[in-house]
Amino acid sequence: MSPPMSPMKPPKGFAPMSCCWSTETMQKWLPFLGWLPDYTWYALKMDFIAGISVGLTVIPQALAYAEVAGLPPQYGLYSAFMGCFVYFFLGTSRDVTLGPTAIMSLLVSFYTFHEPAYAVLLAFLTGCIQLGMGFLRLGLLLDFISCPVIKGFTSAAAIIIGFGQIKNLLGLQHIPRQFFLQVYYTFHNIGETRVGDAVLGLVCMVLLLVLKLMRDHVPPVHPEMPTGVRLSHGLVWTATTARNALVVSFAALVAYSFQVTGYQPFVLTGKTPEGLPDAHIPPFSVTTANGTISFTEMVQGMGAGLVVVPLMGLLESIAVAKSFASQNNYRINSNQELLALGFTNILGSLFSSYPVTGSFGRTAVNAQSGVCTPAGGLMTGALVLLSLDYLTSLFYYIPKSALAAVIIMAVVPLFDTKIVKTLWRVKRLDLLPLCVTFLLCFWEVQYGILAGTLVSVLILLHSVARPKIQVSEGPMLVLQPASGLHFPAIETLREALLSRALETSPPRSVALDCTHICSIDYTVVLGLGELLEDFHKRGATLALIGLQVPVLRVLLSADLKGVLYFCTLEEAEKYLKQEPGTQPYNGSEDSVPEHKIALLKA
């Protein structure tokens, strides 16, 4: 159910700090000040329901994602609550929930060597980097990671994460974590499958699938429905929304039933420390049996993770925020989202959190529950803290196969098969970065993302260096570049002009239509100067038409000799025919039309 109107009012912009903190400035830095004065009892009720729903989802997921990250289960819960509280103050989306995710947990497992100290330090450094990007407004770096690269990465990650849980689903032991070795040893040791784990895991997967299908097909409730029908609808909706908690509780109950009989056919999660860890600064060194590992050595060990983890965290979080903002008709502030995520990771690291980001699945639960403001996260965070205080003794009985089922069912939607058909229909060349990213991610995630991004940038540069040039015949030959003109493209333009105009007999005059050119650089100016000389030597004319003001300003500053520019093609053709009353604009601002002069001086 969705509320008729939310009191959430995200800020329109992100203003720099000033010495005078006005109310508007305060609301931009602390968005909750904008919607809190208008908070209603209706919003409180809906936020409470949404917070409970998300809390029942995040607790079993957090335990499961800690396994993906290669960390003890309690670290998933340590990572699940701080974002709820920080986002209340700093977030600009009413739907987003921050916490552990499958993708981020996978990245953590690659760069932290399954050592909690490394994971906590990575969270701190990730937060610092994200915070710096937010203050410096460097979110634009994410624009260079194209959609095919993201889809290739998430699809590969879904396979890596999903297959990584087969060992827990089947109760296999001593399986390496490197993907290719994992595949080999999983099939090699398939004969050691524990029947109890396999049966329970498959039953949990079936239950999760059935409950999800029920959730997707529950008809909307209407006020005119009888009370009994609405009550039944609420019960079904609650059960299907909290399906992860329901299925994990069922599995734990089954395991406990066997435990009291003295026979245990399942591999259990085991003892989980009670309570929240004491707040402390992240470890900047680690003492092992072989000696002390310094901060510098820890950072060197993380390597590319200090780039990949912050960027992918930002990308995932902002993608989720933008998706639900568009779906629910409100706006977010991307730079403010960076700050919220950065502060979450920094403060979370004080309580042994590993890096977190926005969760698409839990955000969807939040939105479908009718959340009105980020206040819903307060209830989610409170539930996680309560579970750490009072439920950790019960986590002992949760079978690992049940958590594996939760993870597998959570990552299945990440594998996007439709994107291949869409790209084949829209632009087949975009399949190249998708495939490069997808394949190389099985080797190393950072290589996949880097190679895919590089291929995407090369495709972009190719279109810049080889712009399409439309040619029209007439009294003058008209060449119109279909996009901007920058230094890699000057040789393409030269080749087109030489082959179409100067290498013909006799040489032809050309009008270069600059309608689509909004900027040029110094190399282009030099290239145009050389072309003007070539045309002059062969007794032909090169005229520029449709110049935009920024381009005209650059040409005037360069003081090119012999450059002719006209407002329209008709004026250029009249000048070529030497019809009276037509003169080119060249030489200085004195010859430029009055409306252009006004724009130049504006």
From Swiss-Prot:
This is Sodium-independent sulfate anion transporter. Sodium-independent anion exchanger mediating bicarbonate, chloride, sulfate and oxalate transport. Exhibits sodium-independent sulfate anion transporter activity that may cooperate with SLC26A2 to mediate DIDS-sensitive sulfate uptake into high endothelial venules endothelial cells (HEVEC). In the kidney, mediates chloride-bicarbonate exchange, facilitating V-ATPase-mediated acid secretion. May function as a chloride channel, playing an important role in moderating chloride homeostasis and neuronal activity in the cerebellum. SUPFAM superfamilies: SpoIIaa-like. InterPro entries: S04_transporter_CS, SLC26A/SulP_dom, SLC26A/SulP_fam, STAS_dom, STAS_dom_sf. One of its GO terms (cellular component) is apical plasma membrane. Residues 1-47, 91-115, 165-193, 268-300, 359-370, 416-438 are extracellular. Its main location: membrane.
